[in-house]
Amino acid sequence: MIDNVITAIDRVAAEHPTRVAYDYEGTQYTYAQLKEGSDRLAGFFAETLPEHEPIIVYGGQTFDMVEVFLGLSKSGHAYIPIDTHSPNERITQVQDVAHTPAIIEVAPLPIAVPDVQIIRAPALHEAEKTHAPISSLQHAVVGDDNYYIIFTSGTTGKPKGVQISHDNLLSYVNWNISDFGLKEGVVAMSQPPYSFDLSVMDLYPTLVLGGTLKALPKEVTDNFKTLFATLPKLGLNEWVSTPSFAEIALLDPNFNQDNYPDLTHFLFCGEELVNKTAQELITRFPKATVYNTYGPTETTVAVTGMAITQDIVDQYPRLPIGFAKPDTEIFVVDEQGNQVSAGTEGELMIVGPSVSKGYLNNPEKTAKAFFNVGSQRGYRSGDLATMTEDGMIFYRGRTDFQVKLHGYRIELEDVDHNLNQVSYIKQASTVPRYNKDHKVAQLIAFAVAKPNDFESDMKLTQAVKAELGKMVMEYMIPQRIIYRDKLPLTANGKVDRKALIAEVNH
């Protein structure tokens, strides 16, 4: 257990200064460098930035980003990460909500942002080498102060800034380092972009454990040949990603324990881990433990988890997302907010110390989604789930991914889940096509097919529908299946359902 994220990382630097904190394609940075650079940057930020204001940091998967995050934390500022692969309008959308006084350019901004101080890379590099370090941590982020603010997509297209405090982060990190069996000095893959809160799953637990973050930038992950050549050289103990990214790695027949002898932990979050992906990982990595976790950004990365063993895979066609972390209570409630009985589907409510105070500068949305229970904060997740008597939770889809077709209520993710079990399908995502009255007229599935001997897509579709018909009600079978070489992913590595919906409704 740690009591402060910042001092825990500094302690590693004091005790193991030459340990490698960050490795970017073979360029290594030690904990001593991380401490000295972040201390000097903190001194610089204390002089140049207005006190306690959140600051946008624009950049990619680099050591400089981590150093800037820590420098801001030490000088009392929350950071707002924006990844270089975000669309340009994202920068202005975030700034329109956040009104930050400054943007730190770790990488060059692609557009001009008016009426804001821009701190450019040369000034950062000068400061990290020559500026006087901050003299103490008395103004550092602590307690209920915001540590980071991550923007998620809003339903109106206006993004929502989720405020995560130091105490929220501390609750998450302590659970991660105590419950997942990670060792001091762990070597962890750092693949999710910093603007996606899944990155926090590898970033802070690894640093407080004195481990090494192995950066996997998008330029590598976007090129499968490069990716498959790079991954085995990283010497990983821990893999953190969405299930979709692991499914890409599994396309390489060499992705197995023989070629990754030290890989002992898979941690998944961000989307549903399907049974056949878990089975494939368990088969290929007999020495590793596969953990399924769940949590909205609003509750700090993840709030449930469990090891997915062979017994669990055999027992549950749709895998559980685990049990609530010890300091957190999770309830399943009906539309009136009453707790439902075990096994009954309802909405997940999450109460505990890792629940956010709310959305930055958005009291209306905050009031809708968050509530107080005594001194604890609660969050209405919008996720449907069931819970067993002993507290094991099963995810059942989004309340807002429900559609009605011919009077039947259909969970798109339920259709996806079953379609992904079909023997001819590698990956699939189902979307509604609306008619001119904005009613759902058809379900359309986009799918990546496995290699097959069918003479036409029509014959393949007949076989897919026949197999799917054994798993789901007839009204849940998509009317059309469109085959693709790959499905579009969001910047966060999830299947981009919104892009597919837009495609069939243009």
From Swiss-Prot:
Reaction catalysis annotation: holo-[D-alanyl-carrier protein] + D-alanine + ATP = D-alanyl-[D-alanyl-carrier protein] + AMP + diphosphate
Single biological process term from Gene Ontology: lipoteichoic acid biosynthetic process
One cellular-component annotation, GO: cytoplasm
Binding site for ATP: T152, S153, N292, T293, Y294, G295, P296, T297, D383, Y395, R396, G397, R398, K494
EC number(s) given by UniProt: 6.2.1.54
Protein localization: Cytoplasm
Keywords from the named record: ATP-binding, Cytoplasm, Ligase, Nucleotide-binding
Protein origin, superkingdom: Bacteria
Residues binding D-alanine, per UniProt: D197, V301, K494
Pathway(s) annotated for this protein in UniProt: Cell wall biogenesis; lipoteichoic acid biosynthesis
Main location: cytoplasm
UniProt key word Chaperone: no
Molecular function per GO: ATP binding; D-alanine [D-alanyl carrier protein] ligase activity
InterPro entries, per the entry: AA_adenyl_dom, AMP-bd_C, AMP-bd_C_sf, AMP-binding_CS, AMP-dep_synth/lig_dom, ANL_N_sf, DltA, DltA-like
Cystine bridges: none
Function (record text): Catalyzes the first step in the D-alanylation of lipoteichoic acid (LTA), the activation of D-alanine and its transfer onto the D-alanyl carrier protein (Dcp) DltC. In an ATP-dependent two-step reaction, forms a high energy D-alanyl-AMP intermediate, followed by transfer of the D-alanyl residue as a thiol ester to the phosphopantheinyl prosthetic group of the Dcp. D-alanylation of LTA plays an important role in modulating the properties of the cell wall in Gram-positive bacteria, influencing the net charge of the cell wall.
Family: Belongs to the ATP-dependent AMP-binding enzyme family. DltA subfamily.
Protein name: D-alanine--D-alanyl carrier protein ligase
